[in-house]
């Protein structure tokens, strides 16, 4: 018996105490061991977004901007969260819609919200313009990208200030531009051609026409994008302020579904 206990103590000499974890000794080899405290590799947790949102659409009209995004949060290919908002009101003249990682969008919402509060506390009568918010986001996204720890989002910023409509785009690399119509995600391939087709024929839309166009594109995306959902929000900004409507849905028709084959 004593020999048996002696062999056990020899086997576990230098090992972990009950309930503790084994710590690898600090040797030159441990520099390459991920379990070692000496190992310092790149941050990779942001390279795999968990809950994501798909397309955001934006269109300018005479006197404002309209933005739309569905309310689905996808966990991979699973339609996990079906009632999340991907559009935020930044201030009375600016709104923002985001696709990509929802956790990163929540972080940006918190940061932007605090920025707006800090600005209002000054009490000088000034607030961030849509163009200022767009410019700040380009710097923030590029900064995080340069640190190899990007915010995994593509954003559409819409606003109305000084009698001018503003619609801007920022992606996770800090790439930014302005356009009369914008679409992110799968919408860049399916919805943007539809938006441009209408705007090429009629460059200036009314608010009703812009809203109808966006609703039509949301219906097409629901038909064609497997990560979209028939519940969405539409946000409108005019000189009166920002208004977010929803959840909304569109009427769909699946009568021809039985004719589609080869994609099962």
Curated annotation (Swiss-Prot):
Molecular function terms, GO-annotated: lipopolysaccharide binding
Keywords, alphabetical: Acetylation, Cytoplasm, Disease variant, Host-virus interaction, Nucleus, Phosphoprotein, Proteasome
Pfam families hit by this protein: Proteasome
Entry's localization field: Cytoplasm; Nucleus
Modified residues (Phosphotyrosine): 102
Prosegment location in residue numbers: 1-45
Highest taxon, organism lineage: Eukaryota
GO biological process entries: negative regulation of inflammatory response to antigenic stimulus; proteasome-mediated ubiquitin-dependent protein catabolic process
Residues bearing the modification Phosphoserine: 26
Family: Belongs to the peptidase T1B family.
Function recorded in the entry: Non-catalytic component of the 20S core proteasome complex involved in the proteolytic degradation of most intracellular proteins. This complex plays numerous essential roles within the cell by associating with different regulatory particles. Associated with two 19S regulatory particles, forms the 26S proteasome and thus participates in the ATP-dependent degradation of ubiquitinated proteins.
PANTHER family named in the record: METALLOPROTEASE TLDD, PROTEASOME SUBUNIT BETA
Protein name: Proteasome subunit beta type-4
Organism: Homo sapiens
């Amino acid at each position: 018996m004593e020999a048996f206990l002696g062999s056990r103590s020899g086997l576990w000499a230098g090992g972990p105490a009950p309930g503790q974890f084994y710590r690898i000794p600090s040797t030159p080899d441990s520099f390459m061991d991920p379990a070692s405290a000496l190992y310092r590799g790149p941050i990779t947790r942001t390279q795999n977004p968990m809950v994501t949102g798909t397309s955001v659409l934006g269109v300018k009209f005479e006197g404002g901007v309209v933005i739309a995004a569905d309310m689905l949060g996808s966990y991979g290919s699973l339609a996990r969260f079906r009632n999340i908002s991907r559009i935020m009101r930044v201030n009375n003249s600016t709104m923002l819609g985001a696709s990509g990682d929802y956790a990163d969008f929540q972080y940006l919402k918190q940061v932007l919200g605090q920025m707006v509060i800090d600005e209002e506390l000054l009490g000088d009568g000034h607030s961030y313009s849509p163009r200022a918010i767009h410019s700040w986001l380009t710097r923030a996204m590029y900064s995080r990208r340069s640190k190899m720890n990007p915010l995994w989002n593509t954003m559409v910023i819409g606003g109305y200030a000084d009698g001018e409509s503003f619609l801007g785009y920022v992606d996770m690399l800090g790439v930014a531009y302005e356009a009369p119509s914008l679409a992110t995600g799968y919408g860049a391939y399916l919805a943007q051609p539809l938006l441009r087709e209408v705007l090429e024929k009629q460059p200036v839309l009314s608010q009703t026409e812009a809203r109808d166009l966006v609703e039509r594109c949301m219906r097409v995306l629901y038909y064609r994008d497997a990560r979209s959902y028939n519940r969405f929000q539409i946000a409108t900004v005019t000189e009166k302020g920002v208004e977010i409507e929803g959840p909304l849905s569109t009427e769909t028709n699946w009568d021809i579904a039985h004719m589609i084959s080869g994609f099962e």
